[in-house]
């Protein structure tokens, strides 16, 4: 029997080391003023030598489980979304997280939709939880600092490291309402890393460094996010003014400003934290969700909409009702 599903808890983790724009400008031909004006980013968190997608993800997972009041042994599935896993393709980072948190009864899988990963993972987790009636953990964790070329000022200024997580559980009341996923595979070479079986690393570039065609990505990102928002609203018969919180992927402030303009709303209508965390790829949305939750701004019954785009080119969004935690005041 299919059941209602809600987000029962969230968690996140940001590495303690912070790299400011001024620090970057000491080794790159750029300035703090230029980076802020073109991206909205002022700083980013960078993983330490002993940190990785799995270690950061495990911390975020523990925080989410504590928030939900769920023991690791209760989990039926651990889904990790990452494009910077500890190993090249296998073993899955999900297995490493499962072992670290003691989720001995959970199945594990990695999912890679790049920056859209969490929205896709949330959709998969919702379906599994509805079918099996047991808690599911979604973790999005990225060590982007390990895959950017720190001499390429067009990309290294954009990214940061971190992890976010959410626990989904069966619910008496509707929580998760709608998902919308899509892709345009013709844009696969707009954002990529050469280091796979078909495309070995280019010897003239940093090993496996991320390559991005910014001029191609920007218009796609704006169209995809605007289109997703409008589609989810239309498919659920919802008005934008009825949505309490819009949480977009934190890729670039200019992208969010362009989406807001096309939606005819102020950019402040979106939750924005890119200035302090930069683009953390698939971890972007769950980090923002956790920060918003812990700020106290989300009330029981609030309608929330997430939207993201990423390499592939892929995109995804979710709509859900926020439900108060046990012990929380309504």
Regions found by a protein language model. Give the residues of each.
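Flexible, glycine-rich active-site loops centered on histidine and acidic residues
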Residues: 126-130, 134-163
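Condensing-enzyme catalytic core mediating Claisen C-C bond formation in acyl metabolism
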Residues: 1-49, 152-219, 223, 227, ...
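Buried hydrophobic positions in well-ordered alpha/beta secondary-structure cores of metabolic enzymes
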Residues: 7-9, 35, 64, 78, ...
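Claisen-condensing/thiolase-fold acyl-transfer catalytic domains that form or cleave C-C bonds
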Residues: 54, 58-61, 65, 85-86, ...
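Short beta-strand segments
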Residues: 8, 81, 112, 135-142, ...
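Glycine/charged-rich beta-loop-alpha catalytic/anionic-binding loops adjacent to active sites
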Residues: 41-43, 76-80, 99-112, 145-151, ...
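A contiguous, well-structured pocket-lining segment that forms one wall/lid of small-molecule binding clefts
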Residues: 205-274
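Phosphate/pyrophosphate-binding loops at sites that engage ATP/ADP/AMP, CoA/4′-phosphopantetheine
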Residues: 60-76, 227-244, 292-297
């Amino acid at each position: 029997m299919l059941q209602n599903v809600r987000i029962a808890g969230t968690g996140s983790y940001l590495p303690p080391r912070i790299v400011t724009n001024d620090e970057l400008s000491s080794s790159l031909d750029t300035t703090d003023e230029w980076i802020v004006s073109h991206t909205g980013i002022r700083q980013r968190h960078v993983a330490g030598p002993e940190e990785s997608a799995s270690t950061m993800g495990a911390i975020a997972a523990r925080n989410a489980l504590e928030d939900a009041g769920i023991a690791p042994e209760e989990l039926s599935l651990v889904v990790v979304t990452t494009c910077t896993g500890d190993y090249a393709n296998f073993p899955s980072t999900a297995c490493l997280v499962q072992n670290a948190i003691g989720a001995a009864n959970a199945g594990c899988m990695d999912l890679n939709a790049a920056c859209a990963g969490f929205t896709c993972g949330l959709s998969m987790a919702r379906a599994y939880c509805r079918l099996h009636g047991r808690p599911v953990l979604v973790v999005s964790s990225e060590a982007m600092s390990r895959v950017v070329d720190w001499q390429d000022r067009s990309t290294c200024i954009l990214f940061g490291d971190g992890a976010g997580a959410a626990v989904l559980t069966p619910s008496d009341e509707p929580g998760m309402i709608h998902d919308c996923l899509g892709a345009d595979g013709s844009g696969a070479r707009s954002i990529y890393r050469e280091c796979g079986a078909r495309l070995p690393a280019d010897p003239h570039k940093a090993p496996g460094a991320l390559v991005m065609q910014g001029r191609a990505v920007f218009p796609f990102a704006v169209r995809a996010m605007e289109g997703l928002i409008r589609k989810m609203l239309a498919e659920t018969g919802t008005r934008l003014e009825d949505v309490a919180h819009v949480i977009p992927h934190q890729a670039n402030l200019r992208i969010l400003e362009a989406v807001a303009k096309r939606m005819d709303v102020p950019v402040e209508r979106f939750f924005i934290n890119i200035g302090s965390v930069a683009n953390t790829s698939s971890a972007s949305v769950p980090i923002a969700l956790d920060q918003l939750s812990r700020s106290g701004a989300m009330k029981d019954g609030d309608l929330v909409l997430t939207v993201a785009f990423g390499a592939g080119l892929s995109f995804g969004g979710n709509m859900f009702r926020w439900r108060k935690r046990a012990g929380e005041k309504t």
